[in-house]
Amino acid sequence: MAYLNAIYYTDNGPSHGPGFPPVIFIHGFFMDSRMFKKQIHYLQDKYRIICMDIRGFGRSHCAKSKFTLYDIADDIIKLADHLKLTKFVICGMSMGGYIALRACLRYRERVCGLILIGSQAERDNEETVQNYYFLSKSWGDINIRNNIIEQLLPIIIGKNERDQDSWRVTWGSYDNEIIKNAMHAMLTRDEIIQQIKHITIPVLVIHGEQDLGIPVEAAIKLRAN
């Protein structure tokens, strides 16, 4: 575990795997790199696995100003340069998938594969946008915050109470600035549905049929493009 320019990351597995490219994991909104601990444990004997906490989440320092998903894509490349990774796969979950797609579009010569988990290429519909803005504006009210957390836990984490307890504490610690700036980056993202048609590298799309956050139809449309 280490830091690069206030961005926390972990680096596990062989530095020079048997012909396999390194994989950089990018977590979703509200989450941090700990969400991939089981994947790290399973894959690290064969693959080099790098996980980073995006700006403001996990152990990365809080972003004091607004940023875009492309800024996080730039963070990925800076980390890859620091680790001397010429080519690599990016695995992104939900918002992490939004970032992975944009990193691929901006740095085509560096990204050799994508894994998109519970993600989509299109922007959110108006109802979802308004719900997110309500979350952002209401986060300073502790009662509303706690109510939002309890609603989101089964949607994002599932029914495991031990996992819920861990993330409940983490989410409750996020201040307004973290939520506001990350939410701004996610909700103001550009439309890339036409651009992704030009992605030629291998892409693995993984999506749960009962995903409540992003419907599986979004993954079907992503795969079709």
Where do the language-model regions lie?
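Conserved alpha/beta-hydrolase "nucleophile elbow" surrounding the catalytic nucleophile
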Residues: 27-29, 88, 92-97, 208
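Conserved alpha/beta-hydrolase catalytic His-Asp/Glu region
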Residues: 124-130, 143-197
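Short beta-strand/loop motif that positions the catalytic acidic residue
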Residues: 199, 205-207, 211
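Conserved alpha/beta-hydrolase "acid-adjacent" motif
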Residues: 212-218
